[in-house]
Amino acid sequence: MAEKMPAIVKTKPAYGAELVEVDIPKPGPGEVLIKVLATSICGTDLHIYEWNEWAQSRIKPPQIMGHEVAGEVIEVGPGVDTINVGDYISAETHIVCGKCYACKHNRYHVCQNTKIFGVDMDGVFAEYAIVPAQNAWKNPKDMPPEYATLQEPLGNAVDTVLAGPIAGRSTLITGAGPLGLLGIAVAKASGAYPVIVSEPSEFRRELAKKVGADYVVNPFEEDPVKFVMDITDGAGVEVFLEFSGAPKAFEQGLQAVTPGGRVSLLGLFPREVTFDINNLVIFKALEVHGITGRHLWETWYTVSSLIQSGKLNLDPIITHKYKGFDKFEEAFELMRAGKTGKVVFFPHKK
């Protein structure tokens, strides 16, 4: 094996990234080295690429980007006895301490000392990558790599959709970006009906329909609240799933959900959002869930089972596939323009 490899690196504290040759790492204690078979772009990667306020406060260049991955284990470090060379894995990207109050109460997804690879350490946008053995998830050998790399973001969607009953429930989804599209797929696979999607991008509305949305609405051209009320005979939806992080969409969703309904929030908002909490939440007795990370490891079992069931319509969501990283800038700019679903890299061109 060569000693060097290409990797997408955040080389400096500024917009963009670079494709550079870096050393192939060696696994340390408790780590495994994987040959990256597929890796996909997340919204977090886009924030790092754009060098927004959050990225500036968290990222310390130079650093290899990326955290969604599927790969084959080719070397194990000292002390690793749960993962073997040849295993086909994906990875939970939240490295938890196991010692804090949250972890000791089995709430690992909100560990108070969470570290994330591709954020707090080198990531997986490379031909080879290090994964902590405790974070490795063994995949079925017949799962396509482009599906296996999506399990981490699918976990976000699963926790959002399945935070409460969904089968047979009328559902509004705001935002049909990559995570919203995964949310549509999970909602449909779980029996939600009708699934109504509010999304301003025509490209993404068309993707939403391909994934299985029963109704789509452009909130810039129609009132989505009236749209929902017309469909539900004035009752409102039983479930509101927020993926956009847009304050206006959030408010419209609260208006559209029926009293006593359920709200799950995954989209990240500006720090301050103003809305009528008394009339839109308290007096409506809404059940509100904030969603972050994935429950370890319950969510992963659910995600893997959903994929293996064949009920998840993932193919329309994967809109762009690249062999190698040569066109990574094109991929990021397309994502910035809202002209993609999920983007998947296959690092090894052969």
UniProtKB/Swiss-Prot annotation:
One of its GO terms (cellular component) is cytoplasm. The record marks E152 as: Important for catalytic activity for the proton relay mechanism but does not participate directly in the coordination of zinc atom. Pfam families: ADH_N, ADH_zinc_N. Zn(2+) 1 binds at C42, H67, E68. Keywords: Cytoplasm, Metal-binding, NAD, Oxidoreductase, Zinc. Belongs to the zinc-containing alcohol dehydrogenase family. This is L-threonine 3-dehydrogenase. The lineage of its organism: Archaea, Methanobacteriati, Methanobacteriota, Thermococci, Thermococcales.
